[in-house]
Amino acid sequence: MFGDLWWLLILSLLVLSLVTRQGALILLTVLLALGAVLSWLSYRFGLYGVQYTRSLRDRRIFCDQETELAIEVTNAKPLPLAWLLVRDRFPRGLGLVVQDRIHGEDLETFPPELRELIVLRGHESARRTYRVRGYHRGVYTFGTATMASGALFGLQQKRETLEHLDYLTVYPKIVPVESLELSFERPAGTGRAQRRITEDPLRQAGVREYVPGDSVRHIHWKNTAHLGTLQTKLFDPQASEVVMLALDVQTTYDPYQAVPEYLELLISATASLAVDMLEQRQSTGLLVNSGPGDTEHWTHIAPSRHPEQGARLLEALAPLTGFRTLALSHLLYRSMHVLPYGSTVVVLTARTVEPVLLALLTLQRAGHPVVLLTVGDRQPWIPERFTTHHLGGRDAWHQLEGLALA
């Protein structure tokens, strides 16, 4: 409607200028007509030949690490672009570093988005770069983006939505294993001692008296016959054992509630142990009673020492939520048929309920050494037959948050 009135006004001025034969009025009419033509061309062909790309320097980063986000706009036609407004959705939970100040939750728009107003000549490109920091684990989605352009004075606009998405994975917080203070309670009240999680059954280090929970396969029958009491073999730690990390994402007895600090402590401890074990050349796998996006019943990554195993484990841990799809006890029972014989099972949980303890006892009787790592503001009571360590609760997580990466 406005366009018709505009052309009618120009036509009226043209007729008036010809009748009055005033040079200034004729010049004004020509300039207005030329501006109207350019404005119409800008509106009609503004987004034609305009290409928008978004790229991340890294697709996976560690917690507190930075990467670079770049957007590039190319005007592939000879007609200049008077103005182009780009709006690109920026994921909540990431930090946008501008002049060493981190933005993110305080971006002006909701939902947060990047905005750029760009002017381009024909066959010209413009590039903008941003520093992005991942300060919390997760899988973050960039997009969708919207481009708007139009008439010279913005009276008419055309918009185009770009559905292409990009994803950035932020790994869980990884801390030195020493900061977890893994001093384990030895079975049968033998006291606290620093020890590795796994033992090599091929390297015997000594003999001690048998206690309930010890594997029958490790009984030293010759010493048992000599002393008249059951004796168990002790083994040297060795980085060739198979370890399966079993993570319980349910942090309260109500499956529909959660304690975020417990969950982050459990996931950070799992990630830190996995990285440390792989560095020691231990074959390491993962079990979780949840899946990515809560779409799978449970997560299972077979033990491996492959160079890419660490990335597989960290990527599986990054998107986890506190919503479990399977009780931990059921997870342990279901996974028994996929556990390599004699592999050590390290269970990390905030709930040491009776079904879990019974499942651990079943694993022990099946020949799997079991290590239980617990989380909570109060240390739970655990039967002496289990090797256990309490990682702490909310305060422990807040302390780990401030530690440097391992």
For each predicted feature, which ranges?
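Von Willebrand factor type A / integrin I
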Residues: 1-45, 93, 315-406
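Short, structured secondary-structure boundary patches
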Residues: 197, 303-311, 389-397
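An amphipathic, basic-hydrophobic helix/alpha-beta surface used to engage anionic
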Residues: 25-26, 34-299, 344-348, 362
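Short, conserved, surface-exposed binding loops centered on an aromatic residue
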Residues: 235-237, 276-278, 304-308, 335-339
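Short, charged loop segments at secondary-structure junctions
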Residues: 295-326
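A general structural signal for well-ordered alpha-helical packing
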Residues: 267, 271-274, 310, 314, ...
